Amino acid sequence: MIANTAAYHFAVIDAPQALCDQLQARAEASGLQGTILVAGEGLNLFLAGAPSAIDGFYAELRADARFADMRVKTSFSEHQPFARLKAKVKDEIISFRRDDGQPLDYPRAPAIDPATVQRWLRQGHDDAGKPVVMLDTRNLQEIEYGTFKDALVLPIHKFTDLPEALAPHREALKDSTVVSFCTGGIRCEKAALWMLNDGMDNVLQLDGGILGYFEEVGGEGYEGRCFVFDERVALDAELKPLVDEPLPEPRPSAF
């Protein structure tokens, strides 16, 4: 059994390369595969391995006061969905390139828990009677596998395209409560913060993203699966993978 995890945390990282090297060595020693992204603004992790190794890795990470509150979303598969371990230092743990969307520079945008979103979707409005618009901040490749029913889907192929793609819809959204969402929370956190700082005061972020919603309340109101960036391809509302097969053996070198 393989534990598959997605986790991110915004925190000041003074020496990103040193931390990246440290986490890579720790993950390798634990037999983990996946991706470690480190930036001056924090960590973004997609790691998979034996459940005990995963637990140990995150326990040690949370022992660092900067990451004590890191939330980890976990699902399980029979097979390892990553071919190898990659560790990189980036300018941002998710590229947005908007100064007014940087979580270390502003208070976190208000978040809404999955149970409340589920209730609002059932009743067709928020607690003040305003229409609720679910705003998908992911790219079209991901959305093909599924999204919330009647979500506002933008024609974007990368996250940095979102502000321009959202512009034609802003007037129509002004009398609604907008709930931004994404896979695990990181993009909708940056998007919601940028929208608030750019004059949209009716924006919330779905706490934990789609995976958090699946984990806490299931798939009510969501149509299809949630795309993930590994060999599982997508997860259903029970966090079961669309594909769960052994990875192909590496081809022998011709040299």
Could you say what each language-model-derived stretch is?
Residues 181:
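Cofactor-cradling patches in redox/metallo enzymes
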Residues 119-129:
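A short acidic-Thr-Gly-centered motif at the start of a beta-strand
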